[in-house]
Each structure stands twice: as C-alpha cells, then as structure tokens.
C-alpha cells in the first residue's frame, strides 16, 4: 500500500515488492482517492486472507530497527488530519542522481529529503547539504550558507515539485495505437519530402536543397508529371541560376529524374571523379564503357524523353526546326538509320562529307569515341544518340548547322568548334588546313588528349576557349567570320559551354527565352546571373555568344537549337554520370579549357570563382593538439620499471588469506595476481 504524493509518476512504482512473507503486490493510491483506496485495500486483504494487523506485523518484521508505532494507527491518524492542509506524504521513488555521487553523501541528501517529507514541510528553513556541483566547482566549494546561494539551494530542493495543482486525475490506460495493414499506397520518400517541403519557405528550401523543384501534385499521376516536367526543368534551372555551384552538384542528379523518364545512372563518387580529372580520362571518357552499353536502351528511353521534354518545353519548335534546318538533311534519314545502326549512319552524318577519316575511326568504334569525346560522339554516335538523347539530337542539329554554313571552314569536323577556335586563332591561315587539322587531331580523340592537357584540348575542342578568344576576337574579326564562326561556335558551343558552366545550362532557360528575345535576354539574364554567381566568366561567353548569334543573324531556330542542345545537355551529360558540378569542373577543363583560359582572362573573376567554390562549403576548423610540449610524454619515460618484459616477482599478499580462501592454491595465486595488477595500476596512475 503506498500513499503517493502529487508529482510521483505511477509508472515508476513497482507492481510487486519482495518483503518478508514473500512477494507483495503493490497497490498505489493517489492521495485524494482515500476512500476508494480503503475499500480496495480491504478487498485485497480479504482476497489474501489477511487483516490489517497482519500487514502491520509483517511490515514491522521486515524492519530491523526497533518496532515503529503500529502502522495501522498511523494510517488512521493520517486519515483524521484534514487532507489538504499539508501536501500529502510524498513517496520518493529511488531518485538519486549518481552524477554527484562523489560529493554528496547519499545519507545526507536523501535521508534529509525523506525527513523533510515526514515532517511534511517540503521546504524547511534548514539548508541541506547538496551536491556542490550545483554551485560551481567541487573544489572551489562555494560557501553553501551564503545568502545568494540560498535561492539556488531552494530551487534545487524544490526541483521535483510542480506548483501544486488540482489533484491529479488517475492515469487512464492510454489506448495503444493500432496500425491497420490495409493502408493505402504509402507516399514515396519523394512525396513525403515534398510534403515536408511544402511547409518550408521556398527560399529556405532552395538554400537547403539547391536546385530541387517540387512536383506540383504529389498523388497526381505520371501524366501530369510529364506535363510539368517542362516547367520543372525551367524552375530548376532558374533556381540553379540563383544558387552557387553546389547547386549544380545537386541538380546534377536531380535534373534527369526531373525530366520525366528515369534512367539508369552509374554511381560515381564525385571525389574520385575530381581526382581522376587530374590524371586520367574521366569515367565517361574511359572508353566505350558506359555510353556504349547505354545506347541501346538509352535510345528508346531518351528518345521518348527527348520527345516528352522538348515537346513540353517552350522549345517545341526548335525540335521541329531541327528537323527542318540543316539537320533535316541528316536528321531526316540518319535519325532513322541511326536507330538502325549508328555506325551505318556514320556515313550519312553531316560530319561524313567533311570527315571520312574520323568517321572511319568513329565508325570503327563510334561508341568508344562517343564515350571518349562527346564532341566526336556528338557527330559519331550522335545520330545514334540523336535518338538516344535530346542533347545529341539538339546538338546534332546545331552541329549539323554548325556544319551547315561554317561547313565552309569548320565543317570539316563537327569539332566545328575546334575549327572555330583555330579559325579564331589562325584566322589568317588557310581554312582548309584549319579544318583538316583539328578534324584529324581533335577527332583522334579530342577527349583523351583533352585530358592530357586541357590546353591542347582547348585547341581540339576549344569552344569555350573559342568563345573566350572570340570574345576578344569576335569583336574585331571580320563580321563574316564572326557570322560563320559564332554560328559554328554557338552551335557547337552551347553544348561545350553548357558543359563548361552550369550557368549556360541555367541559361538554357534564359537561352530559351533568348530564342524569343535574345538580345534582351542575353544581356539581362547572363548579367543577372553573372551577378548571382561566380561563373561570371562563363557568363561572358554566353553573352558573347548570344550576342554573336544576333550579330551573325543566326536564325532563331539555330539559336533555339543551340539552346536546345544545351537544354538537353543536362540529362545527356548526366547520363555520362557527370553532374553539372563535374561538368563545370571536369568538362570545363577537359572539354573547353575554360577554367584555364578563361581564368587567365577573367582574372579576378576566376579567382572569385575559385574562392566561391571553396567558400560555399565552409572550411572545417582543424583541431590542434593542445599542449605540444616536450614534457608531454615524460610520464612514459619516468617509468620506474627497468626490465619491461620480466614479470614482477610476486610479492606476498598484504593480508593473509583466510583459511577458507587458502583452500586451493589457485585462489591464492589469483589473489596474488590481483594484488600485483592492482599495484601496477596504482603505479600507472
């Protein structure tokens, strides 16, 4: 029988207790339910065949010290006292915090608590000893009696008590929640995330997950999803524009999931990728491996997706135009025969006329090279991929077009941009040579050599560099060439550049608008974004190139396709497993040499970008070892023991083992060993 006070948790009271006479069942009562308790107690005693006298006697028996006054009478006396005068007796159910076990004597502290309750004044004037740790350091033991500590002590002693409240209602057995198995379709992780996100402000969310855009309705089916894919892609790119380059790291994997169909992506640790940028061809250039396996089904997937996306996106037209424009020649048939055989089509591709030789080699392994150089791939397995990837197809068309009029000089290779750049650099040199040479050299494996040295590669696939150089040269070089060239460059470039900077890709949407109002956009948007992000230099290209479109009078369809090419670029690249970040870091180096050439050129901007790159992930503070003094390990040298490895001779145990213990030598030996160990420990301490 327990009479429990207000703030005791019933759940802490044991249901049965081992006392004299066996196990007792504990009946607890809230102090106020006196009568009820009474009758329950009596009922219980009847069941057990005992009387209150028995109870008293048993309790007495179980207490060793001189018998207390009979419990029964005590209970009656308590009954007689008007209930609410004093807080009822409080049962302290084993609350003793061991945290201060060292400096508060249990006896002092806990017994005083109990005594306090017995005299039923929770707060006696007498200040009890209390764990000093509450009042500052143990060793500076602040003087507990001092007045200012008084409140502290009081507060500490009052710790448990809540302000006395209306008598507690009996705790009702709370219903155990039941879980039905027939729950409807559970929301996917994405849906749950989306739902959670809907409660976060959009700006906050963008900081948290950069580049992620929500699907508009969670339950609404795939159909709607397809339709929203376009806006989502747009939003995604916008949000990406505002956020810095980690954004691109995230969008990297997101964007292709966003774009409708979901396709297999190789799992790549970006760190390793960044490492291998330095010494060897990055995973997607590592030969036929990935893109090659992917092509067969990628063709259906992405073909579908290309259709879905591009139809959905504002750029539905470029796709049509892509068919209409120079690529029509290639697109009409190679698109078909690309499906049939990317290799066969190799001959048909726009690059075919110009390029028999890389063609041959590309035909030898269009895929290998496709993997090796997105540029060549763009031409080689491009048609294959034209089906496979929106990028290829969009790129195919700009490339076809790039080939269409720069064909004159650059058509020699869809590495038109290589030609473009060298044309820029060797403006005076014979077109023939420029065209033939980058074709040969770039086609050889622009990517491999690109990796060998982004600079060389900048020659091979220099678009961004071309963009960079031409940024200078465009301006003064003859308009004709500018027209041909940015066109080549723009057509080829948006893709290189899109790779070179996520901004371009972000600009995919601005650039989509650029198709609508290119000048305003080219100026306004990249400007804004240049402000928004360190990629300003890449921006400059963009701007140049967008302006170049205009100057060159590139018909909107090409522009659109350039755009399209890079709109599709996101997914296509991710297929290669590079996220924009890598695309920035790897492709920008490898494919475009941008981060070299432009960094020189953009000087402060380049630096700003580098710093922003590191700054965005805040530097982790490095912990240093506190005292690196020579004395740090002296304790180790001070060891007394001379022969480390000799066992210490067993000394006699300090106390003679009692007869019972000495029974077996083993006990004795164990004793000695324990002793020795103890001493060693002491020594070490």
From Swiss-Prot:
UniProtKB keywords: Cytoplasm, Cytoskeleton, Phosphoprotein
Gene Ontology BP terms: microtubule cytoskeleton organization; regulation of mitotic nuclear division
Major location category of this protein: cytoplasm
Compositionally biased tracts (Low complexity): 299-329, 337-353, 361-401, 409-420, 458-468, 505-519
Record PTM Phosphoserine, positions in chain: 142, 146
Compartments, as annotated in UniProt: Cytoplasm; Cytoplasm, Cytoskeleton, Microtubule organizing center, Centrosome
Sequence ranges of Basic and acidic residues compositional bias: 246-256, 425-440, 473-488, 558-567
Location of region: Disordered: 93-127, 207-263, 281-538, 558-579, 599-623
Motif (PxLPxI/L motif): 647-653
Residue ranges that the Swiss-Prot or TrEMBL entry lists as coiled coil: none
Biased composition (Polar residues): 219-228, 611-622
GO cellular component, one term: 3M complex
Extra facts: Despite its name, does not contain a coiled coil domain.
Function: Core component of the 3M complex, a complex required to regulate microtubule dynamics and genome integrity. It is unclear how the 3M complex regulates microtubules, it could act by controlling the level of a microtubule stabilizer. Required for localization of CUL7 to the centrosome.
Domain commentary: The PxLPxI/L motif mediates interaction with ankyrin repeats of ANKRA2.
Subunit structure: Component of the 3M complex, composed of core components CUL7, CCDC8 and OBSL1. Interacts (via PxLPxI/L motif) with ANKRA2 (via ankyrin repeats); may link the 3M complex to histone deacetylases including HDAC4 and HDAC5.
Classification via PANTHER family: COILED COIL DOMAIN-CONTAINING PROTEIN 8, CCDC8, COILED-COIL DOMAIN-CONTAINING PROTEIN 8
UniProt name for this protein: Coiled-coil domain-containing protein 8 homolog
Originating species: Mus musculus
Taxon lineage: Eukaryota, Metazoa, Chordata, Craniata, Vertebrata
């Amino acid at each position: 029988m327990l009479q429990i006070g207000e703030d005791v948790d019933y759940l802490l009271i044991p249901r049965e207790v081992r006392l004299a006479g066996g196990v007792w069942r504990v009946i607890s009562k809230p102090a106020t339910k006196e009568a009820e308790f009474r009758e329950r107690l009596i009922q219980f005693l009847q069941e057990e065949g005992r009387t209150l006298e028995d109870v008293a006697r048993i309790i007495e028996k179980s207490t060793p010290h001189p018998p207390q006054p009979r419990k029964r009478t005590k209970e009656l006396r308590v009954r007689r006292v008007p209930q609410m005068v004093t807080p009822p007796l409080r049962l302290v159910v084993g609350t003793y915090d061991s945290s201060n076990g060292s400096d508060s004597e249990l006896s002092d502290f806990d017994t005083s608590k109990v005594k306090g309750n017995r005299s039923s004044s929770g707060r006696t004037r007498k200040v009890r000893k209390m764990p000093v740790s509450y009042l500052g350091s143990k060793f500076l033991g602040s003087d507990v009696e001092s007045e200012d500590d008084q409140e502290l002590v009081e507060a500490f002693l009052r710790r448990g008590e809540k302000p006395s409240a209306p008598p507690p209602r009996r705790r009702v057995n709370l219903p155990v929640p039941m879980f039905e198995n027939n729950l409807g379709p559970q929301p996917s992780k994405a849906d749950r995330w989306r739902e959670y996100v809907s409660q976060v402000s959009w700006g906050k969310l963008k900081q948290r997950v950069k580049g992620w855009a929500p699907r508009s309705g969670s339950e609404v089916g795939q159909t709607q999803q397809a339709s929203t894919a376009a806006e989502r892609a747009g939003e995604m790119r916008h949000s990406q524009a505002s956020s810095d380059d980690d954004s691109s790291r995230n969008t990297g994997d997101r964007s292709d999931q966003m774009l409708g169909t979901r396709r297999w992506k190789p799992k790549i640790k970006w760190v390793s990728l960044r490492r291998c940028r330095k010494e060897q061809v990055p995973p997607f250039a590592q030969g036929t491996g990935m893109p090659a396996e992917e092509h067969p089904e990628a063709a259906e997937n992405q073909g579908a997706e290309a259709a879905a996306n591009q139809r959905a996106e504002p750029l539905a037209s470029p796709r049509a135009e892509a068919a209409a424009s120079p690529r029509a020649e290639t697109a009409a048939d190679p698109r078909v025969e690309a499906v049939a055989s990317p290799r066969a089509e190799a001959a048909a591709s726009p690059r075919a006329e110009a390029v028999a030789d890389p063609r041959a080699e590309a035909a030898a392994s269009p895929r290998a090279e496709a993997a090796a150089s997105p540029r060549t791939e763009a031409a080689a397995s491009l048609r294959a991929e034209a089906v496979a990837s929106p990028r290829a197809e969009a790129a195919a068309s700009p490339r076809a077009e790039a080939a269409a009029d720069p064909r004159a000089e650059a058509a020699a290779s869809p590495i038109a941009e290589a030609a473009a750049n060298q044309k820029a650099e060797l403006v005076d040199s014979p077109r023939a040579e420029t065209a033939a040479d980058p074709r040969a050299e770039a086609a050889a494996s622009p990517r491999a050599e690109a990796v060998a040295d982004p600079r060389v590669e900048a020659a091979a696939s220099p678009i961004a560099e071309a963009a960079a150089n031409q940024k200078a040269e465009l301006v003064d070089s003859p308009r004709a060439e500018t027209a041909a060239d940015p066109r080549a460059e723009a057509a080829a470039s948006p893709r290189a550049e899109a790779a070179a900077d996520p901004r371009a890709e972000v600009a995919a949407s601005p650039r989509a608008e650029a198709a609508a109002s290119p000048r305003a956009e080219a100026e306004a948007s990249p400007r804004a974004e240049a402000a928004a992000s360190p990629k300003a230099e890449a921006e400059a290209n963009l701007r140049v190139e967008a302006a170049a479109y205009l100057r060159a009078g590139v018909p909107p369809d090409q522009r659109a396709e350039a755009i399209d090419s890079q709109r599709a670029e996101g997914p296509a690249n991710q297929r290669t497993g590079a996220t924009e970040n890598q695309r920035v870091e790897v492709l920008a180096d490898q494919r475009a040499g941008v981060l070299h050439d432009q960094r020189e050129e953009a000087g402060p901007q380049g630096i700003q970008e580098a710093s922003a790159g590191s700054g965005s992930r805040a530097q982790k503070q490095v912990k240093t070892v506190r005292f690196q003094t020579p004395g740090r390990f002296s304790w180790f040298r001070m060891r007394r023991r001379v022969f480390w490895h000799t066992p210490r001779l067993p000394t006699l145990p300090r106390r003679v083992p009692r007869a019972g213990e000495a029974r077996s030598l083993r006990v004795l030996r164990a004793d000695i060993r324990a002793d020795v160990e103890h001493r060693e420990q002491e020594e070490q301490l």
